[in-house]
Regions:
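Short, solvent-exposed amphipathic alpha-helices that sit
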Residues: 1, 17, 80-84, 108-128, ...
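Short beta-strand elements at the ligand-binding edges of bilobed clamshell
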Residues: 10, 17, 63-87, 100-104, ...
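Hydrophobic alpha-helical
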Residues: 19-22, 32-51, 117, 132-195
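Hydrophobic alpha-helical segments within soluble ligand-binding/sensing domains
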Residues: 72-98, 112, 143-144, 190-194, ...
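Hinge/cleft segment of the Venus flytrap/periplasmic-binding protein
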Residues: 105, 109, 120-122, 210-257
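Flexible loop/hinge segments that line or gate small-molecule binding clefts
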Residues: 40-79, 97, 191-199, 203-204, ...
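Exported/periplasmic ABC-transporter solute-binding proteins
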Residues: 158-159, 172-212, 220, 227-231, ...
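Short beta-strand elements in bilobed, periplasmic/extracellular small-molecule ligand-binding domains
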Residues: 1-14, 18, 97-100, 121-140
Length: 257
């Protein structure tokens, strides 16, 4: 018999929230732990759990700080940022002003997506100017206001890149301003609000990361490790990063009935 408990330690992917959650799971005697590892501060708590005999898998976000986790399941986040940069370049015709809205500057996963984007723009698309970078704490309403502010400050703005949560807020601002197709949005994830804006032509592209696998694989592989000593075939299981646009959205999403 197996029981999987879903614990939400806080609203941000930082050690301030996740470290106490890992400590609590250790204290409560869980046999294994799967956790987001959003910043380096989580690493010593992962190590403490492993040293207490509790295997740990990380998913979605992984710190670069060395730690004793068994495996990571998630996207190559820097590569996702590079993919987003090329999608944006396609959307804006390789030139113009682009703004960046990230979730948290302190979350390593968001930084990888941000720097993958900005590095690629600088290296491959010299005619694209990044006019500003702000954080929205993964909130759609904040992204809405920030997108409005960018469009007001830069009347010739051609694109908005959202690295993490709340891209539908930026898309709503673009739609409300009557600038769908004029200000292009590139984002991540296949949540319904985002996919509707893709279908409507407001979001040019959104990039997936297979969240089902990120939930499924850590649980199954930790179970197999516990009961059979089966070690995962590799320490990093990288999920697919499909790029969805209005042209192929029917392959990935159907509107809710």
């Amino acid at each position: 018999n197996v029981t999987v408990d879903w614990i939400i330690p806080g609203e941000t992917h930082t050690a301030d929230n996740f470290a106490p959650g890992i400590e609590a799971a250790v204290a409560q005697g869980y046999d294994a732990i799967a956790t987001i590892a959003g910043d380096a501060g989580v690493a010593p708590f992962i190590d403490a759990a492993v040293e207490a005999g509790i295997p740990v898998a990380t998913f979605n976000s992984e710190t670069d700080a060395p730690n004793m986790r068994l495996l990571f399941v998630g996207a190559d986040l820097y590569l996702q940022g590079q993919t987003a940069a090329r999608a944006m370049a396609d959307a804006v015709g390789g030139e113009g002003q682009v703004a960046v809205i990230t979730g948290f500057f302190a979350v390593e996963a968001h930084e990888l997506r941000r720097t993958g984007f900005t590095d690629t723009i600088a290296a491959e698309f010299p005619n694209i100017e990044i006019v500003g970078e702000v954080e929205n704490t993964d909130q759609g309403d904040i992204a809405f206001t920030q997108a409005q502010d960018f469009m007001a400050a830069y009347p010739d703005l051609k694109g908005i890149y959202v690295t993490a949560g709340g891209p539908f807020g930026a898309a709503a601002a673009v739609a409300d301003a009557g600038k769908a197709g004029e200000v292009q949005v590139v984002s991540f994830d296949f949540v319904d609000e985002t996919m509707q804006y893709v279908q409507d032509g407001v979001i040019y592209a959104t990039i997936g990361q297979n969240p089902y696998a990120q939930g499924h694989d850590p649980a199954i592989r930790l179970f197999n490790y516990l009961v059979a000593g089966e070690v995962p075939p590799c320490a990093r299981l990288v999920t697919e990063a499909a790029v969805v646009t209005a042209d192929n959205i029917s392959e990935y999403w159907t509107p809710a009935q």
